[in-house]
A protein has these predicted regions:
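Residue at a conserved register position within TPR or TPR-like alpha-solenoid repeats
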Residues: 16, 50, 84, 118, ...
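PAPS-dependent sulfotransferases, especially Golgi type II membrane carbohydrate sulfotransferases
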Residues: 146-152, 161-173, 182-246, 301-302, ...
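Phosphate-binding active sites in nucleotide-utilizing proteins
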Residues: 240-350, 354, 358
Length: 486
């Protein structure tokens, strides 16, 4: 049982965050690690809180202590190893997995995790082998069928489709999010087989399950976007003190499924760029600004009136979190979703930052979003109408920020990049302050872990085959067209 002091430290950390005092919250979590017990169920909550504010080292250590809780539990260990893989500590995860006894190593959920690790690293043949081994032991694992569906291409008459259809009635008894994931996998199978109407019905069924669990409030986001566009003007931003942190930083922004992972992969293929991903660290660094509005930024600046470089401090914290995440001070590519909501503060805080903003055909992007089972943070993607509303807001933000920062934001059209990489890759490199290197033109050969839904696409050469993919679903996209075009 946790002592009163231990409970108080965690509650005090939460209270500090409510006051936007991120530094105090981190101090309390570090103190908890120093003085807290070596194990216990409560460490899972500590890990989750630390992850939310970007303190990955604390999150990992707390997850490790949770995994050591008595009595021994494979489920807790799997949670810890999954956290390690999420933060690119796959070598450590594999090391511990390798110490399991042969019977434990052949548990279906262990095989599933090993398959996930293999897939993230681009070894799809090994991932498929491990998933099939898991399914041979337990054919009724919906999540493993989904994982297998994401890395293979189905064909008419594929026995895997029949096996998934046979399992479908049983999935009605599992929790909705797991059933939804399975339905997305089955939909992808029928999509591969060219059965687009059947696939769309399954995607819609899965999306309805997710929508019932996770509602999106378009009116709230519209108010937020209205405020950003109204308040963040060149004249208003002159009220913010300049940032003294001039280190370069690379960002790739754009809607999900718009080609952001492709550009990330191209940049990571440069010798000066160490890695990249959806790291979710800028939001954490900006916690002291509160709601990320201009008023919040001015309040933060007022609280820090006695400090020499308040915006440089936030930038330094961001770079510290990046170094913790990737283990390097070299350049990394941050392609976290929805940086458009913080773009004004991002470019003010990081005067050395350069942004590549991807744009893609709206209907192709909308369909791809609707067909993707996002794990979190994309509640608008469970409805074609909501996708249209979200895209309209993002269009407004792109127009606003690119007009305000034309020298720092480069807009790249996915269709043009895919069709003419020899023209666009040098332009992207120049914008990011990089010399062109041959490896950037063969980015699919760059080996690294990829955690996004584009894990397969970045392993293949740049191609135009994904342009126009929405045509097969055109009759189903009318709800998107109505809300997007107004």
């Amino acid at each position: 049982m946790a002592s009163h002091a231990q409970r108080s430290r965690i509650l005090d950390a939460i209270e500090a965050l409510k006051q936007y005092d991120r530094c105090r919250a981190v101090e309390l979590l570090r103190e908890e690690l120093r003085q807290g017990p070596p194990s216990g169920e409560r460490w899972r909550s500590v890990s989750r809180l630390a992850a939310q504010i970007g303190e990955i080292d604390i999150a990992i250590e707390a997850a490790r202590r949770y995994s050591r809780t008595e009595p021994p539990s494979l489920e807790r260990l799997l949670h810890y190893w999954s956290e390690l893989s999420q933060y690119d500590r796959t070598d450590k995860a594999r090391e511990e997995l390798g110490r399991l006894s042969p019977p434990l190593r052949r548990q279906p959920n262990v095989l599933h995790l090993l398959g996930t690790l293999a897939g993230q690293e681009g070894d799809f043949a090994e991932a498929e082998r491990l998933y099939r081994e898991a399914l041979a032991l337990n054919p009724g694992q919906p999540q493993t069928w989904f994982a297998l569906a994401m890395i293979k291409t189905f064909a008419p008459g594929d026995p895997d489709v029949s096996a998934m259809e046979a399992l479908r009635p049983a999935t009605e008894r599992v929790e909705p999010s797991i059933r939804a994931r399975f339905l997305y996998g089955l939909a992808k199978a029928w999509h591969d087989c060219g059965e687009h109407d059947r696939a769309f019905a399954l995607y819609s069924e899965g999306a309805a399950l997710r929508r019932a669990e996770e509602r999106w409030d378009p009116a709230a986001l519209e108010r937020f976007v209205d405020g950003l566009i109204r308040d963040f003007t060149p004249e208003a931003m002159e009220r913010l003190a300049p940032s003294g942190e001039t280190r370069p930083a690379l960002f790739v922004n754009g809607l999900p499924r718009s080609g952001t992972t492709l550009v990330e992969q191209i940049l990571v293929s440069h010798s000066r760029v160490a890695d990249g991903g959806e790291v979710n660290l800028l939001r954490a660094a900006l916690i002291p600004t509160g709601d990320h509005s201009l008023d919040g930024a001015l309040r933060y600046q007022q609280r820090m009136a006695g400090r020499a470089d308040p915006w440089g401090e936030l930038a330094g914290d961001y770079f510290r979190l990046l170094e913790m995440r990737f283990g390097t001070r070299d350049l990394v590519v941050d392609k976290t979703l929805a940086h458009s909501h913080f773009m004004g503060l991002l470019l003010h805080m990081l005067p050395g930052a350069r942004v590549v903003w991807m744009r893609r055909d709206p209907e192709d992007t909308a369909l791809s979003c609707f067909r993707t089972y996002f794990t979190s943070g994309v509640a608008w993607s469970w409805s074609l109408e909501d996708i249209g509303r979200f895209f309209r807001l993002e269009d407004r933000l792109h127009a606003h920020w690119s007009a305000m920062f034309p020298e720092r934001i480069m807009t790249v059209d996915y269709q043009q990049l895919a069709a003419h990489p020899a023209h666009w890759i040098p332009r992207v490199a120049e914008h990011c302050g990089l010399e062109v290197e041959p490896g950037m033109f063969e980015s699919h050969r760059t080996r690294r872990g990829v955690l996004t839904a584009s894990v397969q696409q970045v392993r293949a050469p740049i191609t135009t085959t994904r342009i126009g993919t929405s045509a097969a679903y055109s009759k189903h996209l009318e709800p998107f067209r109505r809300t997007y075009r107004g």
